[in-house]
């Protein structure tokens, strides 16, 4: 088990009250940071490009990154899910030279904290689409080796079916991580890892 911070700032130094620097996390021995979460994109207006800059800087400071991408309900209903997540992923790819220390987390915004969850088929479709995007735009090696995890109302009751999808490599768990059912989610991920 390793610890991840929920955010870090985009550059070194400066007076950015309330922000945590990548250097602080590295000095504390925190190996991971979550960047691009939909709440920060929506509430703090973090753009795709800004998230790309944050990912690049965190990596430059020796952190590993869980980079979040995902669409709103309106975007899903408009049929633009892949365009949206591809643009978010491209903004990261444009700023980094290696995906070795990046895990991509697909988190459909409409499924975060709402109790709604993408069906296993919907999750698989987007994860497979992201792998194809990597293959077409980065490399086949990155497509095969980059972990793509799912986040969005993951629970003890849906984790096995979601985790059973070919391209779902694990979970970014929110509220359920504070409940006893989190053990079921961990066990579902362990089964996938050992399979």
Curated annotation (Swiss-Prot):
GO terms for biological process, alphabetical: gluconeogenesis; glycolytic process
CC annotations in GO: cytoplasm
Lineage: Eukaryota, Viridiplantae, Streptophyta, Embryophyta, Tracheophyta
Subcellular location: Cytoplasm
Pfam families for the chain: TIM (PF00121)
Protein name: Triosephosphate isomerase, cytosolic
Gene3D superfamilies recorded: Aldolase class I
Active site: 37 (electrophile), 107 (proton acceptor)
Remarks, miscellaneous: In plants, there are two types of TPIS, cytosolic and plastid.
InterPro entries xref list: Aldolase_TIM (IPR013785), TIM_sf (IPR035990), Triosephosphate_isomerase (IPR000652), Triosephosphate_isomerase_AS (IPR020861)
């Amino acid at each position: 088990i390793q610890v991840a911070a929920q955010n870090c700032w985009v550059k070194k130094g400066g007076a950015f009250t309330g922000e945590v620097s990548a250097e602080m996390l590295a000095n504390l021995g925190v190996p991971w940071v979550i960047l691009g979460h939909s709440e920060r994109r929506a509430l703090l207006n973090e753009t795709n490009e800004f998230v790309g800059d944050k990912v690049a800087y965190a990596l430059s400071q020796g952190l590993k990154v869980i980079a979040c991408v995902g669409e709103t309900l309106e975007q899903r209903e408009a049929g633009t899910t892949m365009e949206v997540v591809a643009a978010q992923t491209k903004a990261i790819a444009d700023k980094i030279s290696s995906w070795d220390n990046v895990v991509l987390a697909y988190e459909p915004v409409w499924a975060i904290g709402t109790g709604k969850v993408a069906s296993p088929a919907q999750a698989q479709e987007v994860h497979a689409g992201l792998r194809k995007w990597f293959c077409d735009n980065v490399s086949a090696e990155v497509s095969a080796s980059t972990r793509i995890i799912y986040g969005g109302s993951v629970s003890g009751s849906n984790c096995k079916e979601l985790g059973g999808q070919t391209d779902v490599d694990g979970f970014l768990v929110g509220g359920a991580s504070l409940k006893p059912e989190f053990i079921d989610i961990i066990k579902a991920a362990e089964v996938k890892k050992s399979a």
